[in-house]
């Protein structure tokens, strides 16, 4: 018996493997043909790994991702499952994608602020414990702790700016580990270790 795929992420990876000229897992995604769900359902109707419900949910997740919405722009062409062109995007679809992308980014930003505020509130609500007075020691010099050495990083070379490269993002107060997901001239999309994605300038990336 064929084992069904467990979630939308696995389904997206599977259909990208079956239809590589239409679906991608990295870089800018291509706008999909209108009605592609029906084509997909027909082509995979005999496939026991995936159901129509899973396909519909996976398509919804794929087309609402920032990577896909970035690819919906004026002049871009829709493609079918085999990568054949199916007409240029209409302006109203481009504007809708822009609005959806802006709304999605605003929600993420609001969620981050809410989490940061919650963390601050929890910190304030913690009971403060009074430190017991330290007994003075008779003229015993305290051993100095060795200073913590900062992790040394360096600026990335141009040939190191590749998708999948593990890098550090300079966040001002320190570096955060990340992986390069997409490169668009000087703008680089990275995924942080906590799963969040963000666009930064190449000059802020370090090895």
UniProtKB/Swiss-Prot annotation:
Primary location class: cytoplasm
Region (Disordered): 100-156
Biased composition, class Basic residues, residue ranges: 127-139
InterPro entries per record: ProQ (IPR023529), ProQ/FinO (IPR016103), ProQ/FinO_sf (IPR036442), ProQ_C (IPR035236)
Localization terms from the record: Cytoplasm
Cytoplasm is among the record's keywords: yes
Residue ranges, compositional bias (Basic and acidic residues): 111-126
SUPFAM superfamilies: FinO-like
Superkingdom field: Bacteria
Keyword flag Membrane: no
Any GO molecular function: RNA strand-exchange activity
Family matches, as SMART domains: ProQ (SM00945)
Pfam families: ProQ, ProQ_C
Listed GO biological process terms: post-transcriptional regulation of gene expression
One GO cellular component, as annotated: cytosol
Keywords: Chaperone, Cytoplasm, RNA-binding
Family, per entry: Belongs to the ProQ family.
Summary of the function given for this chain in its UniProt record: RNA chaperone with significant RNA binding, RNA strand exchange and RNA duplexing activities.
Protein name stated in the entry: RNA chaperone ProQ
Gene designation per UniProt: proQ
């Amino acid at each position: 018996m064929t084992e069904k795929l467990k979630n939308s992420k696995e389904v997206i990876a599977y259909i990208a493997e079956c239809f590589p000229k239409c679906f991608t897992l990295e870089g800018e995604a291509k706008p999909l043909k209108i009605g592609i769900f029906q084509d997909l359902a027909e082509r995979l109707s005999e496939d026991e790994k995936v159901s129509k419900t899973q396909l519909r949910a996976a398509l919804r997740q794929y087309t609402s991702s920032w990577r896909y919405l970035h690819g919906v722009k004026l002049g871009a062409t829709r493609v079918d499952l085999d990568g054949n062109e199916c007409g240029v995007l209409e302006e109203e679809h481009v504007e809708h994608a822009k609005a959806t992308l802006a709304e999605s980014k605003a929600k993420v930003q609001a969620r981050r602020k809410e989490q940061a505020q919650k963390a601050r509130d929890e910190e304030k609500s913690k009971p403060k414990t009074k430190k017991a007075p330290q007994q003075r020691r008779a003229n015993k010099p305290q051993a100095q702790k060795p200073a913590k050495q900062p992790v040394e990083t360096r600026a990335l070379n141009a040939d190191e700016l590749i998708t999948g490269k593990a890098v550090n993002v300079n966040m001002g107060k320190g570096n955060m580990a990340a992986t390069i997901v997409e490169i668009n001239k000087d703008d680089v999309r990275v995924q942080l270790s906590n799963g969040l994605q963000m666009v930064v300038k190449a000059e802020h990336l370090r090895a």
